């Protein structure tokens, strides 16, 4: 499971797109969940379908590194295009 400290963490690079779905949680409080479904790439350029959510709409055409552990997205952070490994960058 995702709490298993022995389970490896995998990183995938994605270029942000429009959300695939916007879920209204509380319209009065302006609270939404943005769902993203994209192809992510490992540092070696291997592709994988990545599903992740955000509590704010992400800017399009920005680069993220998404961390996955035991088939669960645990985090993501924005990275510069120059920090993306070449094989992943070629696919994005």
Map each language-model feature to its residues.
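Short extracytoplasmic
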Residues: 5-39
């Amino acid at each position: 499971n995702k709490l298993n400290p022995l389970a490896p963490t995998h990183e995938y690079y994605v270029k942000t797109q429009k959300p695939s779905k916007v879920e209204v949680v509380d319209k009065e409080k302006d609270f939404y969940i943005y769902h993203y479904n994209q192809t992510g790439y490992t540092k070696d350029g291997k592709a994988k379908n990545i599903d992740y959510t955000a509590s704010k709409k992400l800017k399009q055409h920005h680069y993220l590194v998404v961390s996955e552990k035991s088939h669960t997205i645990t985090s993501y952070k924005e990275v510069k295009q120059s920090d993306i490994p070449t094989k992943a960058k070629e696919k994005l």
